[in-house]
A protein has these predicted regions:
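Aromatic- and histidine-enriched alpha-helix N-cap/loop-to-helix transition segments
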Residues: 7-10, 78-89, 107-110, 149-159, ...
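Active-site core of glycosidic bond-cleaving carbohydrate-active enzymes
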Residues: 1-25, 106, 162-217
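Short, glycine-/Ser/Thr-/acidic-enriched flexible segments
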Residues: 8-9, 50, 94, 139, ...
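Glycine- and acidic
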Residues: 1-4, 67-77, 92-102, 140-142, ...
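Pocket-edge structural micro-motifs
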Residues: 45-47, 136, 199-201
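Helix-terminus loop motifs that line ligand-binding clefts
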Residues: 13-89, 95, 102-106, 115, ...
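Acidic/histidine-rich catalytic neighborhood
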Residues: 114, 118-161
Length: 217
């Protein structure tokens, strides 16, 4: 989210290499999603060798919860899932910055498609609100555990539906087909336009979102 836009201006090929790395991580990301009971690809919070998947330790070494006597879990490993939407958003940024159709055909389209599949399976329909919830996550502050409808996470998943509004939608047929599949993944879950994106405030000031979404308090 921070490095790729800079590289896109300074050296677009480096920006594309960053996403080719994510593409190399796809098999492991698909295994991670499947292990959690989801479809598509769930990209890791901490990543190293592409085939290794998420290298985040399961617990904090040497730390014990005094209340339970158990090792303190690192919940970011499973719950900080906005990374998957971040990858999809980065693909879109590269397309906007380069209009490299070969890159999109070889790498970008599949990254978008598998990200869409993950979010479609991760979101839960809320009959009362008539929208989709994304429950039990950690936002980019890395401290707010077990959050429901974290503003940044939900907004990024919502932004992943940019194809309805973008010029990209009208580009070449092969790429357009992928984007229709991206949107269609959400249509399977009743309505592609409804995901809970209300923002939460503390003391009349937005938190977390102010940093990552540029919302003024």
């Amino acid at each position: 989210m921070f490095l790729l836009p800079a590289w896109l201006v300074i050296d677009p090929e480096t920006a594309k290499r960053l996403l080719r790395y994510r593409y190399a991580c796809l098999p492991a990301a698909k295994r991670s999603a499947e292990a959690g009971g989801y479809r598509g690809a769930q990209f890791p919070w901490e990543s190293a060798q592409p085939e290794a998947g998420d290298v985040t330790p399961a617990t904090v070494e040497g730390w014990v919860d005094p209340a339970t006597g158990r090792a303190v879990p690192i919940l970011e490993k499973t719950d900080e899932i906005h990374i998957t939407a971040d990858v999809a958003y980065a693909v879109w940024q590269v397309w906007q910055g380069t209009h490299d159709e070969a890159f999109m055909a070889d790498y970008g389209d599949e990254l978008l498609r598998e990200s869409a599949r993950f979010w479609a399976s991760r979101a839960q329909w809320n009959e009362v609100k008539q929208c989709y919830d994304i429950l039990d996550v950690i936002g980019p502050d890395e401290y707010s555990e077990h959050s429901d409808n974290n503003a940044y996470t939900n907004w990024m998943a919502h932004v992943a539906r940019f194809v309805d509004l973008s010029d990209f939608y009208d580009e070449r047929a092969a790429i357009r087909t992928i984007l229709l599949q991206f949107r269609g993944e959400f249509r399977v879950k009743r309505n592609p336009n409804r995901i809970f994106t209300a923002f939460h405030f503390e003391n009349n000031r937005p938190f977390t979102v102010a940093i990552f979404l540029g919302i003024e308090s």
